[in-house]
Amino acid sequence: MARTVQCVLLKKEADGLDFSPYPGELGKRIYEQVSKEAWQQWLKHQTMLVNENRLNLADARARQYLARQMERYFFGEGADQPTGYVPPTA
């Protein structure tokens, strides 16, 4: 039986992650409160942030920026959108 969580982002009960995707306290919070579906949404957003902002993940500042964005995405006021980004219409 799959582990379920009350997803903080989707505001519903959903399948939980199989393991903590990030170290430390933030990783523990994500494991306990974020669903697989929400994590996949974050990965897409993270990829967009890396590409549009031309982040070099070998740079510690870029990794710190992404960690802050991840925390804001799930537990804060939401992550940054790249400059000029217009969400697609359905």
UniProtKB/Swiss-Prot annotation:
Domain of life: Bacteria
Keywords, ordered alphabetically: Iron
SUPFAM superfamilies recorded: YggX-like
GO MF annotations in UniProt: iron ion binding
The UniProt record lists the keyword Iron: yes
Single biological process term from Gene Ontology: cellular response to oxidative stress
GO-annotated cellular components: cytosol
Known role: Could be a mediator in iron transactions between iron acquisition and iron-requiring processes, such as synthesis and/or repair of Fe-S clusters in biosynthetic enzymes.
Sequence similarity: Belongs to the Fe(2+)-trafficking protein family.
Protein name: Probable Fe(2+)-trafficking protein
